[in-house]
């Protein structure tokens, strides 16, 4: 296997040279490596360091005693960066013999053999066998085949990436139903829909093991969804998390939407505002996507590090921190098209909407999205006035 060396953060590893003529990081390579996920990994380093410090505040243990599982490690770059740049013990697992060999090579290359362990196992088997303070799932595709084992294995924190955004966001409807046991909607806020369906699925998996969760940071970026969750042991905490599960009713005719908390509920097929048929999505997570204090902790970690995507990462985390804690965002252009007006500048529109007494924020999802507690009729009136 031909390889080349790459450096991310302060960590240098060997990664496979992709097949000739293949422009995008290919699944055909003997060991998968995606340079476009450097932002994801940079944030992971900062976020995992923030998680580790939270563990140390509550547990009488040393940094190196905290265990982190990179369940599908491939080249090992994510887990090795955690070991090298965070200083906690990383278990780097991959079922591929080629990947396992490369991980062993990279452990030697980075000089972290005292706090890095390579394993070559089925990820589900490993997670059923052992418990880890932090479990990181970053599979090629959907994380759903691994969530039962991961939610059992994670003691304090669970970090999950989903790259199957088409099923999550409703573009591949039946696939999304099968994988996530939820009805998605493929509309203007489909990216947030994907985040909340993923979180809803994780909450239900955790509940099977009498665990609850608190989302600390969740974002939809490029072709993937990523979330960082605090895991909370106890049946009562699992029950509490279930109170943040529910459904969305959305009218595409007038833009009215309603959320309904609970799993066994009755929802009208008709819009309570205009009477037209509505689309219903769920079950999905209706609680917070981000914890502002945790976002600040991640920002401090980013500031203290030399990272290739530092400014981009900081911008993303700031946007997440400052989002209103409301499901779901609105798309300004969709509403303008609905009422037949030109879209004004976002800053001017947000200022005008705030003058009505409404709370408003931009979001990290798109440049033309916003969240508000204003009613749809108020939003339309403001847009017509500009």
Swiss-Prot record:
The UniProt record lists the keyword S-adenosyl-L-methionine: yes
Residue ranges occupied by any Trm1 methyltransferase domain in the UniProt entry: 4-383
Protein name: tRNA (guanine(26)-N(2))-dimethyltransferase
Binding site for S-adenosyl-L-methionine: 41, 78, 94, 123
UniProt keyword annotation of Plastid present: no
UniProt KW keywords: Metal-binding, Methyltransferase, RNA-binding, S-adenosyl-L-methionine, Transferase, tRNA processing, tRNA-binding, Zinc
Function: Dimethylates a single guanine residue at position 26 of a number of tRNAs using S-adenosyl-L-methionine as donor of the methyl groups.
Residues holding Zn(2+): 251, 254, 271, 274
Organism, scientific name: Methanococcoides burtonii (strain DSM 6242 / NBRC 107633 / OCM 468 / ACE-M)
């Amino acid at each position: 296997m031909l390889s080349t060396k790459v450096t991310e953060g302060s960590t240098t590893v060997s990664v496979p040279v992709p097949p000739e003529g293949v422009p995008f990081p290919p699944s055909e390579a003997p060991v998968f490596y995606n340079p476009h996920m450097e932002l994801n990994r940079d944030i992971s380093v900062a976020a995992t360091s923030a998680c580790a410090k939270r563990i140390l505040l509550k547990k009488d243990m040393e940094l190196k005693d905290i265990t982190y599982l990179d369940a599908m490690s491939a080249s090992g770059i994510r887990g090795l960066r955690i070991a090298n740049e965070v200083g906690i013990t990383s278990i780097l697992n991959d079922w591929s013999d080629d990947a396992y060999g490369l991980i062993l090579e990279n452990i030697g290359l980075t000089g972290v053999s005292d706090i890095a362990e390579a394993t070559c196992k089925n990820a589900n088997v490993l997670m059923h066998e052992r418990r880890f303070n932090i479990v990181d799932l970053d599979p090629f595709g959907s994380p759903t085949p691994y969530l039962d084992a991961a939610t059992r294995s994670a003691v304090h924190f669970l970090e999950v990436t989903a790259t199957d955004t088409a099923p999550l966001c409703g573009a591949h409807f039946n696939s999304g139903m099968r994988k996530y046991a939820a009805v998605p909607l493929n509309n203007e806020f489909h990216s947030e829909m994907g985040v909340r369906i993923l979180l809803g699925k994780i909450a239900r998996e955790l509940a099977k093991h009498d665990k609850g969760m608190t989302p600390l940071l969740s974002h939809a970026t490029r072709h993937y969804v990523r979330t960082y969750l605090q895991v909370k042991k106890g049946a009562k905490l699992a029950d509490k998390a279930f109170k943040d599960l529910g459904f969305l009713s959305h009218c595409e005719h007038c833009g009215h939407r309603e959320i309904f908390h609970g799993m066994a509920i009755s929802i009208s097929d008709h819009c309570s505002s205009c009477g037209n048929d509505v689309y219903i999505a769920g079950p999905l997570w209706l609680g917070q996507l981000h914890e502002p204090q945790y976002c600040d902790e991640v920002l401090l970690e980013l500031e203290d590090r030399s990272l290739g995507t530092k400014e981009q990462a900081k911008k993303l985390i700031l946007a997440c921190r400052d989002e209103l804690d409301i499901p779901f965002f609105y798309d300004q252009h969709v509403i303008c098209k609905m009422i037949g007006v030109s879209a004004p500048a976002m800053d001017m529109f947000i200022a005008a909407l705030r003058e009505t007494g409404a709370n408003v924020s931009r979001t990290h999802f798109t440049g033309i999205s916003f969240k508000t507690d204003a009613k749809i009729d108020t939003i339309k009136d403001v847009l017509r006035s500009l």
